[in-house]
Amino acid sequence: MDAVKKKHWWQSPQLTWSVIGLLCLLVGYLVVLMYAQGEYLFAIMTLILSSVGLYIFSNRKAYAWRYVYPGLAGMGLFVLFPLICTIAIAFTNYSSTNQLTFERAQQVLMDRSFQAGKAYNFSLYPAGDEWQLALTDGESGKNYLSEAFKFGGEQKLALKEADALPQGERANLRVITQNRAALNQLTAVLPDESKVIMSSLRQFSGTQPLYALANDGTLTNNQSGVKYRPNADIGFYQSINADGSWGNEKLSPGYTVTIGWDNFTRVFQDEGIQKPFFAIFVWTVVFSVLTVILTVAVGMVLACLVQWEALKGKAIYRVLLILPYAVPSFISILIFKGLFNQSFGEINMMLSALFGIKPAWFSDPTTARTMIIIVNTWLGYPYMMILCMGLLKAIPDDLYEASAMDGAGPFQNFFKITLPLLIKPLTPLMIASFAFNFNNFVLIQLLTNGGPDRLGTTTPAGYTDLLVSYTYRIAFEGGGGQDFGLAAAIATLIFLLVGALAIVNLKATRMKFD
C-alpha cells in the first residue's frame, strides 16, 4: 500500500494564496502612501521589487530564481537605485536653496503676507477654562471683545465693541508665548467686517498677500510693485526690468530644475572648484598609492620576521602585531588624534624633549598629510601582514636551501625569492586596497576633517581632503549653501574613477567578462 504523504495545515494552498494576497494588499497600500507623499521613485522601486519577489516565490517555474533574487534585490536597492538617483541629481540644481518643486515654491511665496491697515493692541483674559480676546484701538481708544473660546485649530472670532475690558488679571507674556501657535490660527473679525490676525506678541493687525499671481505665472509685489517671473535656467523667481530683461533680485525659496551638464562643466571651468578638485584628486591618488606601498612593505617585513624559525615567542609577537586590526578603526583614529595634539599630545611632548621640535600636525599641510599616512599605515599593515604570513607558507623551503648553498644572504633571499613570489598573488589585493583607500572617508573625517583649509576656493576644501570627503563637505558643510547637485556630479566622477580601477583589477587578475 502506497504511503500517503500528509501535509500540515500551514502547507495548504489556500493559506499560501491568502498570505500572498495580504502581502499584495500591504504592498499596494505602501505604494499608494509613497505616491501620495510625492515619493515617486521609492513607490516605483517598491512596486517593482515586490512584484518580482511575489512572482518568483509564488511560481514554481521560477524556483531557481529564489536563491538569486535576494542578492539581486539587495544590489538593486542599495547599489543601483542610489547610483541612479545620484546621477540624476547631478544634472539638476538641487541644493539647500533649490529643494522644492516649482508648485511648492510658488505656494510658499503666495502664502507670504505683509502688515496693512490698523494695528490693535490685544489682551487675553481668562473666562473659566476658556479665554476672551480683547483688542484696543490705540488711536480712538475703542475696545473690542470676543465671546469665550477655547484654543484649538483655525477659528474666526466675531468681536463686538465693548465699553470696558473684562475684570480680572489678563494673561501675561509667558502665557501668550506658550499659546502663540494657537493664537496664530485665530482670525478676529471686527464690527466693520475687517479681519486682523496676530502680527506680534502684543498686536493684531490687518494683513494682505505680499504677492499677486497673474495668469502668465508672473508675481507682483503688492508693496513695491516689482514684478517677478520664473527663470527656468536658475530655478528662482527673478525680477524683470521695464524692458523685459532679467533684474538682479531673486526670491527664495527656489525650485529644482534640470540644468544639463552645468555641474560637470563647473568642476572643470570654475577656477574656485577646478584648482582644489585637481589638487585633491592628485593627493587622493598619492595617498592611496603611498598607503598601499607602506602597508605592504611593513606587513611583509613583519610577516617575514614572525615566521623566522630562530625567533622565540613568535606567537606573542603575532598577537601583538595583529592587535591594531582587532581594535575598531574609529577608536584608533580618535586615539591618534589625541596623541598628535600639537599642544598636549604625547608625540609632540616626546619630540620636544628629544629634538626640541613641535610639528604643527593639524595646521601645516605637509605634516598633516604625513600624519594621515602614518595613521593609515598603522591601521592597514596588520591586514597585509596576515596575508603575507599565509602566502609565505606556500613558498617551498627548497628554494631557500638552494640559495643558501649558493651563499645568498637574508636580503638576497628577500628580494630575489620572497618578494617576487609574494607580489604576484598580492597584486589584486593591493588594487582592492588602493580602491578602498581612494574613498577612505572615515579616516579624514575623524582625524583632520579635511583641514587645514585651502584659501580662495569657491567650495569648502582642505589640504588633507580626499575626493569623497571633499564631496561630503560640498553637500553638507557648504558655507554658501549645501550644493547637492555639484556634490552628486563629483560623486559621479568618483564612481567612474573607481569603476576604472575595478576594470584594472579584473584585467590584473585575468578574469574574463562573460
From Swiss-Prot:
Keywords: Cell inner membrane, Cell membrane, Membrane, Sugar transport, Transmembrane, Transmembrane helix, Transport. Residues 1-12, 58-69, 307-318, 393-412, 507-514 are cytoplasmic. InterPro entries: MalF_N, MalF_N_TM, MalF_P2, MalF_P2_sf, MetI-like, MetI-like_sf. Residues 281-505 form the ABC transmembrane type-1 domain. The chain crosses the membrane at residues 13-35, 40-57, 70-92, 284-306, 319-341, 370-392, 413-435, 484-506. GO terms for biological process: maltodextrin transmembrane transport. This is Maltose/maltodextrin transport system permease protein MalF. Residues 36-39, 93-283, 342-369, 436-483 are periplasmic. It comes from Klebsiella aerogenes (Enterobacter aerogenes). It is a multi-pass membrane protein.
